[in-house]
C-alpha cells in the first residue's frame, strides 16, 4: 500500500499534465454544434471557439493588421516585390508573350483587329481633340511651319523641265486663247475704256500726244471688244499667233525657272512666312479636327494594323532590343514608384480590404479544421510546452506524496 502512495500521485500528475493541452484544445472546440434537449440548448454546446467564431475572426484580423500587416510592413513588402530585377523580368515576360502572339498566325487576325480599333480611336477621336486644344496656343506649330518655309519653300526652285511643263500647262489649260479673249472682253468695260483713254491723253507726250488727243484709244478699244465678241474664233486665232510671235512659252519658262522667294526682299519674305503660319494655324483651328476625322474615316485601319504587325513580326531590331526595352521600362517604373509608392499603398490597402478577407477566411474554416491546425502547431512547434506540462504534473504529484507522508 505504501508503494502506491509513492508512485500513483507522480504518475497521475505526469499523465494529467502531459495531456492537459490536448484536452483543453478539444474542450475549446468540442462539440462542433449545439445540442438541444426538449428545445433547450445544453450549456457549453457548441464549444467556446465555434460559438464565438465570428467575433474571434474579427479579433484575429484586427490583430494581424495591427501588429503584422501594418502599412509600413506592406510598403516594405511591396518594395521587395517590385525590385528592378523582378520588374524587368516581368516586363520581359510580357514582351515575350506579345511577340509569341505576333508569331502565331491564328491570333494575328484578332490582334490586327484590336490594333486597328486602337489606331482608329487614336486618329479619329483622340488626335482631333488634341489638335483642337493645342491649336488655341499662339505658338502652335510655329517652329515646324517656319522650318518648312525656310528649308523647303525658300529653297524651292523649278528645274528647266518643270518650268517648261508648267508654262505649257498655263498656256494650254489655265490661259488658252479662249480664256484670254473672254478675260479681255470682261476687262474692256465702258468704264475701263474711258479710264484708259483719259490716262493715255494725260500721260502721252511728243507725237503720241497728237495721236492721243486727235484719235484717242476709246474707238480702238471699242472696236477690239466688238471684234472679240462678234468674231471669237478670229480673235482667238490672233491671240494664238500673238503668243507664238512673242515666244510666250519660252519667256514664261524663263520667268518660272528664275522664280524664287530668295529674290524677294527680306521684309517680304518675313511677311510671307508670317502669313503662311497664320493661315495654317487658322485653318487648323477651324477645320483641323474635322479634316483629321474625315481623313481617318477613309483609311483602312485593319490593313494598316496588319502592315504594322508584319513589320514588327519581322523586325530583328525589336527582338534583339527586348532586354534593353524591359530594362528601360523597369527603371522608369522604379523612379515612379520611389516617388508615389507610399501614396499608392495607402490607396491600395483600403481597396484590398485585407482585414475583411482574413475574417471571412477564418469564418469559412470549419471548427474541425481550426482544431486540427492548432493541434498540429502544438505538436510540431510547441512540444516543449507539452513536455513542460507533464513535468509540472509530475512535480505536483511528488509534492502531494510529501504532503501525504507528512
UniProtKB/Swiss-Prot annotation:
Q: Does the keyword Transmembrane apply?
A: yes
Please classify the protein's predominant subcellular localization into one broad category. Answer: membrane
Q: Which domain of life is it from?
A: Bacteria
Under the heading InterPro entries, the entry gives: DUF445, UCP032178
> What UniProt keywords apply to this chain's record, in alphabetical order?
Cell inner membrane, Cell membrane, Membrane, Transmembrane, Transmembrane helix
Q: Any stretches that span the bilayer, and where are they?
A: 1-21, 385-405
Q: Which GO terms describe its cellular component?
A: plasma membrane
Compartments annotated for it: namely: Cell inner membrane
Question: How does this protein sit in the membrane?
Answer: Multi-pass membrane protein
Keyword Transmembrane assigned? yes
Q: Pfam families per the record?
A: DUF445 (PF04286)
- Return the similarity comment: Belongs to the UPF0754 family.
Name the PANTHER family on file. UPF0754 MEMBRANE PROTEIN YHEB
Q: What is this protein called?
A: UPF0754 membrane protein CYB_2931
Q: What is the protein's species of origin?
A: Synechococcus sp. (strain JA-2-3B'a(2-13)) (Cyanobacteria bacterium Yellowstone B-Prime)
The organism's taxonomy opens as: Bacteria, Bacillati, Cyanobacteriota, Cyanophyceae, Synechococcales
Amino acid at each position: 500500500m505504501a508503494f502506491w502512495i509513492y508512485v500513483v500521485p507522480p504518475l497521475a500528475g505526469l499523465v494529467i499534465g502531459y495531456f492537459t493541452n490536448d484536452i483543453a484544445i478539444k474542450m475549446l472546440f468540442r462539440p462542433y454544434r449545439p445540442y438541444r434537449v426538449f428545445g433547450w440548448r445544453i450549456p457549453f454546446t457548441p464549444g467556446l471557439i465555434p460559438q464565438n467564431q465570428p467575433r474571434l475572426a474579427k479579433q484575429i484580423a484586427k490583430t494581424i493588421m495591427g501588429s503584422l500587416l501594418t502599412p509600413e510592413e506592406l510598403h516594405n513588402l511591396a518594395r521587395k516585390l517590385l525590385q528592378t530585377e523582378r520588374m524587368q523580368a516581368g516586363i520581359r515576360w510580357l514582351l515575350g508573350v506579345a511577340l509569341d502572339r505576333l508569331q502565331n498566325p491564328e491570333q494575328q487576325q484578332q490582334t490586327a483587329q484590336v490594333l486597328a480599333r486602337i489606331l482608329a480611336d487614336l486618329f479619329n477621336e483622340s488626335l482631333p481633340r488634341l489638335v483642337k486644344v493645342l491649336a488655341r496656343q499662339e505658338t502652335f506649330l510655329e517652329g515646324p511651319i517656319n522650318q518648312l518655309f525656310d528649308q523647303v519653300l525658300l529653297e524651292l526652285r523649278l528645274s528647266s523641265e518643270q518650268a517648261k511643263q508648267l508654262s505649257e500647262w498655263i498656256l494650254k489649260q489655265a490661259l488658252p486663247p479662249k480664256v484670254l479673249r473672254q478675260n479681255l472682253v470682261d476687262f474692256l468695260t465702258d468704264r475701263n475704256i474711258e479710264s484708259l483713254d483719259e490716262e493715255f491723253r494725260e500721260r502721252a507726250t511728243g507725237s503720241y500726244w497728237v495721236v492721243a488727243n486727235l484719235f484717242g484709244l476709246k474707238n480702238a478699244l471699242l472696236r477690239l471688244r466688238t471684234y472679240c465678241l462678234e468674231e471669237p474664233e478670229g480673235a482667238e486665232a490672233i491671240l494664238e499667233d500673238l503668243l507664238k510671235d512673242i515666244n510666250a512659252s519660252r519667256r514664261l519658262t524663263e520667268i518660272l525657272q528664275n522664280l524664287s522667294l530668295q529674290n524677294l526682299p527680306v521684309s517680304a519674305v518675313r511677311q510671307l512666312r508670317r502669313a503662311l503660319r497664320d493661315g495654317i494655324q487658322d485653318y487648323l483651328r477651324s477645320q483641323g479636327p474635322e479634316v483629321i476625322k474625315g481623313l481617318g474615316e477613309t483609311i483602312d485601319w485593319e490593313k494598316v494594323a496588319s502592315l504594322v504587325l508584319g513589320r514588327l513580326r519581322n523586325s530583328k531590331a525589336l527582338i534583339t532590343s527586348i532586354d534593353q526595352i524591359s530594362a528601360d521600362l523597369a527603371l522608369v517604373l522604379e523612379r515612379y514608384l520611389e516617388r508615389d509608392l507610399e501614396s499608392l499603398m495607402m490607396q491600395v490597402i483600403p481597396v484590398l480590404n485585407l482585414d475583411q478577407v482574413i475574417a471571412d477566411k477564418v469564418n469559412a474554416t470549419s471548427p474541425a479544421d481550426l482544431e486540427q491546425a492548432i493541434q498540429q502547431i502544438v505538436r510540431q512547434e510547441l512540444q516543449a510546452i507539452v513536455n513542460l506540462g507533464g513535468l509540472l504534473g509530475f512535480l505536483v504529484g511528488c509534492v502531494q506524496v510529501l504532503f501525504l507522508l507528512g
